[in-house]
């Protein structure tokens, strides 16, 4: 009977522990050192998926919709779904060849996503840089004009490639703090992205 009662108590404690929220890390004593370690860890993430809500404001137009992004190494697939019958745009490819598809239109092919988006939509996104910005990293190969960190060693602000990026929220995904809300601003374009779901691997 004693062993039975002890087993019940132990099982109850295990179940309670499983229901408790994950402990958030404490602020870093050295955010810059934590940031260096964080960059090395994030750079190892090659395969991921995200979905979220996107708002785009250009000079004369504005759109809202859903964004789904899949990254597999250098291969990517981006799907924009716009509400109220505004349609969808699918963009996929790699650093050498990119294809854009829209309903009832012939596929468009080019060597860069920026070229295709500028031709089809009238505005362009730095897709090659966004791949890294979405993870909370600077894009390699572009000088960082300015950046700032929070007390946990995560990016708060980043100025790179003519874009101003602000990270307003992070969420814990498989032991990584990944962005949950990002604002991106360019002289001719503003984006607001709320990421609802992350999946790594």
Curated annotation (Swiss-Prot):
InterPro entries: LolA/LolB/LppX (IPR029046), OM_lipoprot_LolB (IPR004565)
Signal peptide: 1-18
Localization, UniProt: Cell outer membrane
Cystine pairings recorded for this chain: none
Lipid sites, type S-diacylglycerol cysteine: 19
Transmembrane parts of this sequence: none
Record has Lipoprotein as a keyword: yes
Chief site of localization: membrane
GO biological processes: lipoprotein localization to outer membrane; protein transport
GO cellular component, one term: cell outer membrane
Membrane topology type: Lipid-anchor
Lipid linkage positions (N-palmitoyl cysteine): 19
Keywords: Cell outer membrane, Chaperone, Lipoprotein, Membrane, Palmitate, Protein transport, Signal, Transport
Pfam families, per database record: LolB
Record bears the keyword Heme: no
Subunit organization: Monomer.
Family recorded in the similarity comment: Belongs to the LolB family.
UniProt function note: Plays a critical role in the incorporation of lipoproteins in the outer membrane after they are released by the LolA protein.
Protein name: Outer-membrane lipoprotein LolB
Phylogenetic placement of the source organism: Bacteria, Pseudomonadati, Pseudomonadota, Gammaproteobacteria, Chromatiales
């Amino acid at each position: 009977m004693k062993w039975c009662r002890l087993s019940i108590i132990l099982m109850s404690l295990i179940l309670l522990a499983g229901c408790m929220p994950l402990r958030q890390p404490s602020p870093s004593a050295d955010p810059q050192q934590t940031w260096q370690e964080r960059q090395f860890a994030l750079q190892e993430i090659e395969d991921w998926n995200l979905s979220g809500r996107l708002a785009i404001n250009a000079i004369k137009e504005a759109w809202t919709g859903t964004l789904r992004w899949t990254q597999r190494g250098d291969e990517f697939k981006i799907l924009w779904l716009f509400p109220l019958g505004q349609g969808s745009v699918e963009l996929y490819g790699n650093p050498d060849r990119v294809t854009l598809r829209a309903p009832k239109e012939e596929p468009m092919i080019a060597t860069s996503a920026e070229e295709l988006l500028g031709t089809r939509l009238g505005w362009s996104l730095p897709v090659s840089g966004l791949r890294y910005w979405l993870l909370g990293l600077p894009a390699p190969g572009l000088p960082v004009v300015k950046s700032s960190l929070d007390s946990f060693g995560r990016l708060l602000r980043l100025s790179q490639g003519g874009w101003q990026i602000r990270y307003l929220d992070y969420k814990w995904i498989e032991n990584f703090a990944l962005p949950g809300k990002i604002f991106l601003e360019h002289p001719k374009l503003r984006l607001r992205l709320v990421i609802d779901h992350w999946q790594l691997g």
